[in-house]
Amino acid sequence: MIDKLKTETRNQATMALDSMPIHDILKAMNREDGKVPTAIATQLPQIEKAVKLVIASFQQGGRLIYAGAGTSGRLGVLDAVECKPTFGVSPEMVRGVIAGGEQAFTEAVEGAEDDERAGANDCNRLNIGEKDTVIALAASGRTPYAIGVLKEAEARGANTVSIACNKEAKMSQYASVAIEVETGPEVLTGSTRLKAGTAQKLILNMISTTAMVGIGKVYQNLMVDVQPTNQKLVERAKRIIMEATDSTYETAADYYQKANGHVKAAIVMILLDCSYDEALTKLQNAKGFIRKTVDK
């Protein structure tokens, strides 16, 4: 029953929320938010397992698919769309799907989360396969749509991961890796867009970022596959080249042009004193890893 879920119980520290001064409300929210990283820390071994599945999928040419309803679905879409500009991957490589379709991102779609079959249908629509990793999110851990996604993804041979914010979540039994972060009662009873949503976002940050490190999208702690799609990102790309090679801005800008805006190639060209074509060949031989390229 939903009333047994800790995410749905009342927070005893905020029973008088409607009469608390603004400052006290903010302190209470800040205090509760501070509990989230500690809760996540207990699940790091499970998160690590999930990351390894995602890396394996990427190495085989597979995809990472996030799926959820409401806030959970929106958070998956948010993380997915940020991967393209940050890591230079195709929008197909990391996808986010939400119960009720795209319109559900900006407005609630009545009954969408209760439709288990819709979760299965979305897996079919995306042609989920054995090379893919599917991560279903649900704060309650019992959302039918998310369970439908996991069941169908497993049936189609994909890696499956569940992220819930309650222990002994129903959806965990349908995932090969189950992440259960107990975030507890919300400041505003049942409003899982708060601590539960924060926990989900932090976990997705961990999974996508660490997986991208694992396939060579990062050098040192620099996002070397950034896509310079606007002037701000062009400048960031040049500064990444500067930092990675300890060169001047002028040198970085020069090699940025010589490399046709390819940040990785520019870095290798400077560090190994080679041509653009040679840099591309070396990177290809090292499967895109700059460190493996320059340390040979």
UniProtKB/Swiss-Prot annotation:
It holds the Pfam family GKRP_SIS_N. InterPro entries: Etherase_MurQ, Glucokinase_regulatory_CS, MURQ/GCKR, SIS_dom, SIS_dom_sf. Pathway: Amino-sugar metabolism; N-acetylmuramate degradation. Residues 54-217 form the SIS domain. Keywords: Carbohydrate metabolism, Lyase. It comes from Shouchella clausii (strain KSM-K16) (Alkalihalobacillus clausii). This is N-acetylmuramic acid 6-phosphate etherase. Specifically catalyzes the cleavage of the D-lactyl ether substituent of MurNAc 6-phosphate, producing GlcNAc 6-phosphate and D-lactate. The gene is murQ. One of its GO terms (biological process) is N-acetylmuramic acid catabolic process. It is an enzyme of class 4 (lyase). Belongs to the GCKR-like family. MurNAc-6-P etherase subfamily. The active site is at residues 82, 113. The keyword Lyase applies. Its EC number is 4.2.1.126. It catalyses: N-acetyl-D-muramate 6-phosphate + H2O = N-acetyl-D-glucosamine 6-phosphate + (R)-lactate.
